[in-house]
Amino acid sequence: MTVDLDLLVQLGDYDRPQGVAERAVQAEELGFDRITVGETTGWNIVPPLTLAADRTEELGISNDVISPYGRTPAMLAQTALTMQDAADGRFRFGIGPSSPAITERWHGKEFDRPLRRTREVIEIMRGVSEEGTPAYEGEIFEIPGLKYERGPHENPPPIDLGTLGPKATEMAGRFGDGWTPQLFTKDGLRERLEDLERGADLADKDLSDLRVAPIVRGMAAEDRGKAREKARSTIAFMLGAYGPYYGNSVAEQGYPDVVEEIRAAWDERDTDAMAAALPDEVLDELAPAGTPEEVREWVADYAAIDGVDAVRVGFVDGLSEEDKRTTMEAVADIA
């Protein structure tokens, strides 16, 4: 199998940023190709990623979806280029439209025109890396521009987009270098890849020019019931409580009644009912959860989808260190 295997970790799982670097070393030893870390309302993503880059030799380093509202486009460009140099060319920058909750309740910005903003941020970032200036005239940003003191970069990091919907995914194909979707069934992913390819066509690119790395969250354990219970709770919570986008996406993939029931339970803040509303059929479509053999087979099948270049494996919530190690070992020999 020629696909890469990425490891997605959450900053909230660690007591200190150095823990991310320790996980990166573990991932490299097990044969993972890349580690990626998300940023929401906890630590700033840059120090943990820098530590991870410094402690590893060949492991790819990525941030997961970063908000286009929380930093200026020029600062995002500086961050990406700095990380690329810190990682000796192993960095990939991840961005996406974000969500109303993060944008308005954390960054204090209006969640306005997210796709247009994301596009303009990418174009400004490319201006800094390729032309040495953020100068730009757009519908959202007008920047007179100063000179980036380090000049154009010889090897700027690729830009990956985390998107779900058809128009957003078309944008990813057109303006990005990679795509990192989440919570897609196999059939749903195949269908959305058509939107990605359409966007690539608009930019005179092939689908093969993009790194397609779908995110899956799961758990492997000899106690199959425990693994499925924890995965069910996490996936249900994502569908009901993480804003509208994941739920809308899964509903459009054929499960509107399931999403509606989960959301109704969330309205009552009944997390047990949320989990109970996620049937085995849907859990099996969305998450690798079960024995190590079952999880390994699930991820291998997902990796075999035509057009997939990597599978980005993350943990469901509430795992012990032993649980995480078992899950990593279950999938480490797939790539």
Q: What is the predicted role of each segment?
A:
Residues 112-148, 194-301:
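An alpha-helical appendage that flanks or caps ligand/catalytic pockets
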Residues 14-27, 79, 162-174, 291-302:
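Short, acidic/polar
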Residues 25-29, 49-60, 80-91, 173-174, ...:
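Acidic (Asp/Glu)-rich catalytic clusters
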Residues 1-62, 69, 157:
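N-terminal beta1-alpha1-beta2 module of alpha/beta enzyme domains
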Residues 3, 77-81, 85-210, 221, ...:
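Internal, glycine-rich beta/alpha segment that forms the wall or movable "lid"
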Residues 5-11, 35-37, 60-64, 91-95, ...:
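Hydrophobic faces of well-ordered beta-strands that scaffold small-molecule active sites
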Residues 1-5, 14-19, 26-27, 202, ...:
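Haloarchaeal acidic low-complexity proteome signature biased toward cell-envelope/secretome components but also
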Residues 5-18, 65-74, 153-164, 217-221, ...:
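Active-site mouth loops of central-metabolism enzymes
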